[in-house]
Amino acid sequence: MKVFYINPQSYNNLSTYDLSLLKNIQGHDVTYYHCDQYQHDILPGNSNKCYFHYNKKKYGITKGISYLCSIIRITIDAIIHKPDIVHVQWLRVWHIDYVFALLMHWMGIRLIFTAHNILPHVIKKNDKRHYKRYYKLVDNIIVHNSRTRKELAELMDISERKIKVIFHGVLNSDTAKADVISRADELRELLHIKPSDIVFSCLGVQKEYKGTSLVIDIWADNPELNANPNTHLLIVGRSHGIDYAPIIGFSNVYILDQMISDLDFDAYLHLSSAILLPYIRISQSGLLFSAVNQHIPVLVSDVGGLTEPLSYGNIGWNIGTPTKENLQRQMLELVRRPDEIEAIKNNSQEFDKVRKAYDWESIGEKTSSLYSGEY
């Protein structure tokens, strides 16, 4: 099958996802359309086309025009090369993406969409109606867990038969381990973190749906956390609408409100005792699978597929519903019993079980089977 694989957001964890998946798709002629922030080596055996440049544009209207031009170029390629399948990873501008999907449908091209989330993280007025139209138009939808499959079918009134469950794999870093350890040691010294200290971390872009405000409220209100010299909170990554004022004055809190390099991301992950993932809503988290790669325990809320990896290996704690009380209870338990963190962190067999369950080879095989119409 000739496949156009399109990801306009192929940067950071999303570019690692693409690389890991495409390396394991066999028996198909894949053309990979990505953005200019793709961070990995060009994939051998595939055609690679850097068509998306909207990230470099300063204003919204110029970003939109740039994105439209990219989609027009892909449409022209589709007319010329006649792919059997178009596989879209993310939607950026709904009206443009929907018209593109209509054109592919009219051309008789099979359309597959990976729903990394059912709806955007920040939901606007017409999003549900728009996404419902898109979901009904496409031929197949990939989701990352059975729970999301059921939720999507019910919310959008579509048959579960067109929704296929294909896991999100463990995200392997291509940064040299020695460099990560060296940078983590530098950060540890800079932040005055002792090897025996407990470090809770929120990494990546910070938004309300990730539960960052829950973490802030808990730290601000609890002296067992905010006045403890052996416990630290790191919040690293660009924020959108997060109020850090309640925790600014605490000496054991470090906030870095900016994008960071892959090396620094891996280093902050490495020096963390536990990653906080009290998401309010999500289907699956790339950060969770980055933590698995480095054997860093996670605290996850029971939403989407976040708890599913814990069923394959004891790699962290399920806090249940993402409430202040539930998250605080678990954080305090770990502060009082740090041996629990070390027991999980040092049990490589449990992390290996999760890695095996979310193996990219089997994910690639399943995706290849879907392309062939066998799944």
Task: Give the label of every model feature segment.
Residues 5-6, 63-66, 75-95:
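Short N-terminal targeting/anchoring amphipathic segment
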Residues 339-372:
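A charged, aromatic-enriched C-terminal amphipathic alpha-helix characteristic of glycosyltransferases
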Residues 139-181:
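Donor nucleotide-sugar binding/catalytic pocket of nucleotide-sugar-dependent glycosyltransferases
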Residues 193-210, 216-219, 233:
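Conserved donor-binding/catalytic core segment of Leloir-type glycosyltransferases
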Residues 267-283, 296:
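Acidic donor-binding loop of glycosyltransferase active sites
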Residues 243-267:
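Nucleotide-activated donor-binding/catalytic signature segment of Leloir-type glycosyltransferases, i.e.
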Residues 312-325, 333-339:
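Conserved acidic donor-binding segment of nucleotide-sugar-dependent glycosyltransferases
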Residues 7-69, 92-94, 148, 238-241:
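N-terminal strand-loop element at the rim of the active site
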